[in-house]
Amino acid sequence: MKERTIQPVNNGLNGNITIPGDKSISHRAVMFGSIAEGKTTIKGFLPGADCLSTISCFKEMGVEITQNGDEVTVVGKGLEGLQEPKAVLDVGNSGTTIRLMSGILANTPFFSCVQGDESIAKRPMKRVTNPLKQMGANIDGREEGTFTPLTIRGGDLKAIEYISPVASAQVKSAILLAGLRAEGVTAVTEPHISRDHTERMLEAFGVKVTREGKTVKLSGGQKLTATDIQVPGDVSSAAFFLVAGAIIPNSKLVLQNVGMNPTRTGIIDVLEKMGATFTVDLINEGASEPAANITIETSSLKGIEIGGDIIPRLIDEIPVIALAATQAEGITVIKDAHELKVKETNRIDTVVAELTKLGARIEATDDGMIIYGKSALKGNTVNSYGDHRIGMMLAIAGCLAEGKTIIEDAEAVGVSYPTFFDELQKLAK
């Protein structure tokens, strides 16, 4: 369990930074390329542990995948070409891999067993296994399909019209992917619109997808045709440096090639509402996945209320938004964020516990947290608990704190941002 020592940043963070590829898009590019017909080239791929787990799983099913840094080539097998894996499919720490891949495996006529690490073993799978069973999938797991390992014997499925109790792109995507080989029209309706990378990328691969309000539909029997994918930078990774630029004195950062998918840019809306000083320059308007260069500098922030429809658009950024709120004037209330409880950790509890160790005034609620602003942070020993987003949030907090901060289990950040600490060090010079 490696630890990192973070020293206070006295002269601010300054410079340009190219954000690594979007994790959600990288996963999907490998998966969709694997079930497409033809060769897909992916540029800007995120070579983090989670996305490498996706590559490993599809290689195990006979897909020829070549990876060289952030460029990946996938020779697709088509929807019917995957081979029965000889070994257990290990997703590591990746919830995206296990949930989306379950949708693909549910309609593939062979047996597979899927498992992950200790964190995955605690994460709820019934939200995916239940609708897949309704489609006719033979799928099981511990506690009646609630937890991994999952066993899946794929076969013929029937389309369903599913009303999801949660706004989850992973649930929606698993059902849509299962629907590719189901008989009829598969529809998913959500309480709020979740991130739409699956719909955008299916369309890029030639699949017709229909959107009507909060409902997404596709017809079974459509084939995927290989295409080249350019992955923009991950706005969830950019969020840590956006907040750092806003709250660390004497800072000015230019973040290049940040993904600006409107279902993901809640962090931008929140920083604007809090009063942050920044500019957004779109660089590829009209692309399937828009991107921008963002310039941000030290700002005077104010507390706000965050809840409702915006939560699915920033669920992964809430840990670092909470940190920003500790430096804002007034009180920030985050609500409607129950999903935080079923992430890599219970992020309500971990954010509150670890920021409290650093001197923040913050309280947990059932569906979020209340943060009292203008806290003077003091260095301490804190822990990521194996959660990459908690680790990065604590590193930014450490830059601001008085005295040194020691982060235990710091290597967890490699899941989504392998070069994070190197970038932080470079910007602090």
UniProtKB/Swiss-Prot annotation:
3-phosphoshikimate binds at residues 23-24, 28, 168, 170, 316, 343. GO terms for cellular component: cytoplasm. The active site is at 316 (proton acceptor). SUPFAM superfamilies: EPT/RTPC-like (SSF55205). Pathway: Metabolic intermediate biosynthesis; chorismate biosynthesis; chorismate from D-erythrose 4-phosphate and phosphoenolpyruvate: step 6/7. PROSITE patterns: EPSP_SYNTHASE_1, EPSP_SYNTHASE_2. InterPro entries: Enolpyruvate_Tfrase_dom (IPR001986), Enolpyruvate_Tfrase_sf (IPR036968), EPSP_synthase (IPR006264), EPSP_synthase_CS (IPR023193), RNA3'P_cycl/enolpyr_Trfase_a/b (IPR013792). GO terms for biological process: amino acid biosynthetic process; aromatic amino acid family biosynthetic process; chorismate biosynthetic process. Gene3D superfamilies: Enolpyruvate transferase domain. It comes from the Bacteria. Keywords: Amino-acid biosynthesis, Aromatic amino acid biosynthesis, Cytoplasm, Transferase. GO terms for molecular function: 3-phosphoshikimate 1-carboxyvinyltransferase activity. Phosphoenolpyruvate binds at residues 23, 95, 123, 170, 347, 389. Its main location: cytoplasm. It is found in: Cytoplasm. Belongs to the EPSP synthase family. Catalyzes the transfer of the enolpyruvyl moiety of phosphoenolpyruvate (PEP) to the 5-hydroxyl of shikimate-3-phosphate (S3P) to produce enolpyruvyl shikimate-3-phosphate and inorganic phosphate. PANTHER family: AROM/DEHYDROQUINATE SYNTHASE (PTHR21090), PENTAFUNCTIONAL AROM POLYPEPTIDE (PTHR21090:SF5). Monomer. This is 3-phosphoshikimate 1-carboxyvinyltransferase. It comes from Bacillus cereus (strain ATCC 14579 / DSM 31 / CCUG 7414 / JCM 2152 / NBRC 15305 / NCIMB 9373 / NCTC 2599 / NRRL B-3711). The gene is aroA.
